[in-house]
Amino acid sequence: MRNRRNIFLIGPMGAGKTTVGRLLARALGMEFWDSDKEIERRTGVTVPMIFEYEGEAGFRRRESEVIADLTGKERIVLATGGGSVLAAENREHLAARGLVIYLQCSVQKQLERTHKDMNRPLLQTENPRQRLEELLRVRDPIYRELADYVVDTGQHSSRSAVRRIINAYEKSGTRLRTE
């Protein structure tokens, strides 16, 4: 049976998953988790260091372990890494264990939000825009297929996104807030 009390945020880097996730968890009295931060906590090193020493495959393996663990929790909001949806096992855990929200935004908005962040290994390239466009081309169909709801964070504030998520979910017949 699907656990509709967890909320999992998916989407590209810079879409606001961590920011919206923290606000959403606070509004709902739920626990917030960020899969990338949990990977760093468990390994004691940064995501860029994992990419450097283990490559993307090593990082994705660690990410799958963390997602399997975290999605087994109750009443959490989880901000996932942008590429977490690439692994079938991650998609299965997310779909079966909670409500999946796709936070989407334009490549331009992603660039504005991430251009100074050196902790984005996939953007350490000569042409970050082209890289983001490539990632979106591959991942957007996966995000859309997996998502229960899609919320555009490029045109609205984080607080507005939180309100839209809560309203959409409550219209589906389940109350999220703890009274």
From Swiss-Prot:
Substrate binds at residues 36, 60, 82, 139. It is found in: Cytoplasm. The keyword Amino-acid biosynthesis applies. ATP binds at residues 14-19, 120. Binds 1 Mg(2+) ion per subunit. Gene3D superfamilies: P-loop containing nucleotide triphosphate hydrolases (3.40.50.300). GO terms for molecular function: ATP binding; magnesium ion binding; shikimate kinase activity. InterPro entries: P-loop_NTPase (IPR027417), Shikimate/glucono_kinase (IPR031322), Shikimate_kinase/TSH1 (IPR000623), Shikimate_kinase_CS (IPR023000). Its cofactor is Mg(2+). Coiled coil: none annotated. CDD domains: SK. Mg(2+) binds at residue 18. Pathway: Metabolic intermediate biosynthesis; chorismate biosynthesis; chorismate from D-erythrose 4-phosphate and phosphoenolpyruvate: step 5/7. GO terms for cellular component: cytosol. It catalyses: shikimate + ATP = 3-phosphoshikimate + ADP + H(+). Keywords: Amino-acid biosynthesis, Aromatic amino acid biosynthesis, ATP-binding, Cytoplasm, Kinase, Magnesium, Metal-binding, Nucleotide-binding, Transferase. Its main location: cytoplasm. Disulfide bonds: none annotated. Its EC number is 2.7.1.71. Transmembrane segments: none annotated. GO terms for biological process: amino acid biosynthetic process; aromatic amino acid family biosynthetic process; chorismate biosynthetic process. Catalyzes the specific phosphorylation of the 3-hydroxyl group of shikimic acid using ATP as a cosubstrate. Monomer. This is Shikimate kinase. The gene is aroK.
